[in-house]
């Protein structure tokens, strides 16, 4: 693009239009200049024209790189946090909302897991109190004193590390003690037990019902059988 300063000022073919109009036009091609597209040249002291048009307020045009948003129409937002080319905002709405790329990085979110208050009475043989079903000594200090103790709720993604002396009770967050040889405690909630705990060794194939002879009638009591036939006394 040719700058205005490079054009000869005394040239009869150069006509200076208004800055907001068609710009500058050079009739170097002679009578075919009307058929050619007009070249729009910005004034030398102002940057290139944004697509939304100039802002009416002249103070908004003298903007620097520290300005993140503006109220004028077609304001350029130059933000050091925004990568890439500067954006042009049409701030026709009164409430200006910044884009996500321009907002500073947020602080890390707090842990969404709920805090549960556990009240327990510590005894040498175990712990009496509200906790997991079949909970053993999960605190190394559980034989010392009664305690009231905050911790993350184990029902919502218990952590895999020991925290405040509390070891997680989920069987898949522990070492698989049943695989190592010792029998681990059955899971307290709805997790599936390990396949090694199944009776009769590890199950290799799907179990199908055997074709067996019908039982003797003494093992299959009738629907209206008397209670003495079932071995109970009334």
From Swiss-Prot:
Chain spans, region Disordered: 1-65, 182-234
Lineage top rank: taxon: Eukaryota
UniProt name for this protein: Putative uncharacterized protein FLJ36797
Organism name: Homo sapiens
Source organism phylogeny: Eukaryota, Metazoa, Chordata, Craniata, Vertebrata
């Amino acid at each position: 693009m040719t700058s205005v300063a490079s054009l000869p000022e005394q040239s009869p073919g150069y006509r200076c239009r208004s800055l907001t109009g068609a710009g500058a036009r050079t009739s170097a091609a002679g009578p075919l200049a009307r058929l050619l597209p007009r070249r729009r040249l910005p004034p030398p002291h102002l940057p290139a024209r944004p697509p939304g048009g100039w802002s009416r307020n002249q103070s908004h045009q003298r903007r620097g790189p520290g300005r993140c948003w503006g109220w004028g129409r077609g304001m350029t937002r130059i933000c050091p946090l925004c990568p890439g080319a500067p954006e042009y905002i049409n701030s026709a709405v009164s409430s200006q909302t910044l884009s996500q790329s321009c907002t500073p990085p947020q602080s890390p979110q707090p842990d969404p897991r709920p805090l549960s208050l556990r009240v327990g009475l510590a005894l040498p043989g175990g712990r009496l109190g509200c906790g997991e079903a079949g909970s053993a000594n999960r605190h190394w200090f559980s034989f010392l004193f009664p305690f009231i103790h905050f911790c993350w709720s184990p029902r919502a993604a218990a952590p895999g590390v020991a925290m405040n002396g509390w070891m997680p009770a989920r069987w898949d967050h522990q070492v698989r003690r049943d695989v190592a040889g010792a029998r681990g405690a059955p899971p307290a909630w709805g997790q599936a037990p390990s396949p090694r705990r199944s009776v009769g060794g590890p199950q290799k194939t799907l179990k199908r019902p055997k074709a067996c002879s019908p039982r003797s009638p003494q093992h299959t009591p009738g629907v209206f059988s008397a209670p003495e036939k079932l071995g109970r006394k009334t």
